[in-house]
């Protein structure tokens, strides 16, 4: 375990993330430009695909970080049976949900019930599939829909704000089931689908297209919102949410509806819109 990961056990997660949020939304020219230039240089951010390629045109660091892409910079897989990758990033892990457990790293796993904050909500995904995608600081930070779905409920699960970088994934037990997260449940033509937005150290917020800012939310109680009857339908490939700094999204699918696309595995670099899995039609 690295020194940084060890320190995250004792660091004041909330205070540091609150400070990061204040900096991210600062419109002081010197502050925001220093942050933009530092992150661009350190992580090799490619602005040529951005709708606004001029790093000095962004009013805040957060505006830079949640930047839109040019039209056509990402296109969905042409196969109508393809469920799409929800974001740019890197596969942390993916595979079957076996006996209700989701693989995190060698020697590490957690239950779907822990992740979703509800054993009943987890039951339909037993023996299904999961994919965990890590968004690094250089990546496009909007999350899109793998498949067309109608929003049913969201569940805010309070928790810690550990780093979700590779070292933390290898060494922090049940990491994604311990960090603060927003669980989004959708109804689709094949049954339930869940997308889980996992918070992390220095993540200054998670926003959804239907409700705005969802994280940070203070308190220690699980909060559920019921959207049934609201008619919130998000089409395949449509934007769903965004991270106001890098983090992780986990997609859960029920059993018997899809097979994972060949060539995907842990550490695979992925792009929004490529095939994640393919429907088992007929």
Swiss-Prot record:
Subcellular location: Cell membrane
Details of cofactor binding: Binds 1 pyruvoyl group covalently per subunit.
Modified residues (Pyruvic acid (Ser)): 247
PANTHER family, sorted: PHOSPHATIDYLSERINE DECARBOXYLASE, PHOSPHATIDYLSERINE DECARBOXYLASE PROENZYME, MITOCHONDRIAL
Catalytic residues identified in the record: 88, 144, 247
The organism's place on the tree of life at top rank: Bacteria
Protein name: Phosphatidylserine decarboxylase proenzyme
Keywords linked to the UniProt accession: Cell membrane, Decarboxylase, Lipid biosynthesis, Lipid metabolism, Lyase, Membrane, Phospholipid biosynthesis, Phospholipid metabolism, Pyruvate, Zymogen
Entry EC number(s): 4.1.1.65
Subunit and partners: Heterodimer of a large membrane-associated beta subunit and a small pyruvoyl-containing alpha subunit.
Cofactor(s) the record lists: pyruvate
Top enzyme class: lyase
GO biological process: phosphatidylethanolamine biosynthetic process
Species in which this protein is naturally found: Xanthomonas oryzae pv. oryzae (strain MAFF 311018)
Post-translational modification: Is synthesized initially as an inactive proenzyme. Formation of the active enzyme involves a self-maturation process in which the active site pyruvoyl group is generated from an internal serine residue via an autocatalytic post-translational modification. Two non-identical subunits are generated from the proenzyme in this reaction, and the pyruvate is formed at the N-terminus of the alpha chain, which is derived from the carboxyl end of the proenzyme.
Pathway: Phospholipid metabolism; phosphatidylethanolamine biosynthesis; phosphatidylethanolamine from CDP-diacylglycerol: step 2/2
